């Protein structure tokens, strides 16, 4: 967590006093995720909007598909978000009004970090060039139907 939050710029030292029996396991507390609901290539414009809602796992120009996890939400619920929408340019003078600050670099996870991150309703895809997280049920309607079928806890 420290390495992720500091974006790789932290030094950490520790000393051990000994070993003790492990107590009760802590419950997992993770915020929700940002889920792409349209397939295509991500755009800087839409990622700027998504960045306001949480931490991104993808950068601009990345191919995404429906149900792919593109970031972590700042709140506890999952949000379906459009990360492929482009900015409509109607007038050249107006296009310079909407210049936003640059994107923060996306968080790149190792296999171990991704395995620790995913929940029961999520999967991890491992390919030679990429590591992708996705929902088990890709479409939003399928996930809503599944939630209705499950008894509330």
Q: What are these model-predicted stretches?
A:
Residues 1-153:
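Accessory interaction regions appended to the cores of large information-processing enzymes
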């Amino acid at each position: 967590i420290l390495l992720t939050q500091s974006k790789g710029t932290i030094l950490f030292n520790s000393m051990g006093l000994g070993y003790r029996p492990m107590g009760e396991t802590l419950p997992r507390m993770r915020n929700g995720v940002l889920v792409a609901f349209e397939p295509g290539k991500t755009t800087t414009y839409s990622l700027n909007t998504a960045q306001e809602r949480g931490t991104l796992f993808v950068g601009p120009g990345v191919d995404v598909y429906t149900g792919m996890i593109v970031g972590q939400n700042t709140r506890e619920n999952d949000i379906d978000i459009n990360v492929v929408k482009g900015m409509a340019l109607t007038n050249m003078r107006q296009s310079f009004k909407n210049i936003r600050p640059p994107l923060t670099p996306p968080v790149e996870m190792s296999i171990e970090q991704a395995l620790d991150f995913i929940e029961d309703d999520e999967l991890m895809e491992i390919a030679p060039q990429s590591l992708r997280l996705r929902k088990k049920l890709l479409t939003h309607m399928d996930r809503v139907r599944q939630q209705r079928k499950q008894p509330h806890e």
